[in-house]
Amino acid sequence: DRKAPKQLAQEIVDKLEVVTPGVETPVSRLSGGNVQKILVGREIASNPNVLMVAYPVRGLDINSSYTIYNLLNDQKKKGVAVICVGEDLDVLLELCDRILVLNGGRVSGIVDARSTTKEKLGLLMTGSGEEKQANE
């Protein structure tokens, strides 16, 4: 079911509470936070099986951040694999089920987000933590 581009744009604007004079306003005239919301909404609108987002709430106020959190969590509930790249541990712990930590270009651990702490992640990030395997 393909929607008309204008209708789809309006749905994204409404759902993500994008502050804009109208859907025909060029993205270049929007604030950074509103551009971020449009980018996430556009990707979700394509109904992907896998969704990769990098720094999905960077530059957003707390209300907009929670709008994005809820949207990404809804995608996970629909069975979409959501891969999130980031460095803000609070965001990663909020959005992720599992966290893969890199140090020096190598995997230093894969941990369950619900049972880890920022301190443990920090140790893995610096190479000081105990290596965790993917099957744990």
Question: Model-predicted segments: where are they?
Answer:
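Glycine-rich phosphate-binding loops of nucleotide-dependent enzymes
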Residues: 1-136
